Amino acid sequence: MRHGHGLRKLNRTSSHRLAMLKNMMNSLIEHEAIKTTVPKAKELRRVIEPMITLAKVDTVANRRLAFDRLRDRDSVTKLFNELGPRFAKRPGGYTRILKMGFRVGDNAPMAFVELVERAEEGAAEAKAAE
């Protein structure tokens, strides 16, 4: 039986998939909004939401767990100093996935992944990038 095994393989090896998700987590923490395909966005949501929940309680052990998963000191610092306190009263649902049409080259469905309570400077950056 195949119960409870609902992860997407995304046509990648396991090491490539893990590295890609780490990079996407770091980008989302740094920029607070990224553009990607819909399946990647849905997988990213599955891994970033527990990281933000972990950052709500700022302990050395939690920082070490976060660093083990992110491998970037700047991302861990921002996660615990800015994002954890920002989402302290929100019981989950930290990300929003907005569908935004199809990619020109291969017609892949694209999505905009952003943190729900974005900082104002992050919102201004995203509008400038569009």
UniProtKB/Swiss-Prot annotation:
Record-level Gene Ontology MF annotations: structural constituent of ribosome
Pfam families given in the database record: Ribosomal_L17
Keywords tagged on the record: Ribonucleoprotein, Ribosomal protein
Keyword Plastid belongs to the record: no
Superkingdom in the source lineage: Bacteria
Keyword Ribonucleoprotein tagged: yes
One cellular-component annotation, GO: cytosolic large ribosomal subunit
Biological processes per GO annotation: translation
Known partners and oligomeric status: Part of the 50S ribosomal subunit. Contacts protein L32.
Sequence similarity: Belongs to the bacterial ribosomal protein bL17 family.
Xref: HAMAP family: Ribosomal_bL17
Descriptive protein name: Large ribosomal subunit protein bL17
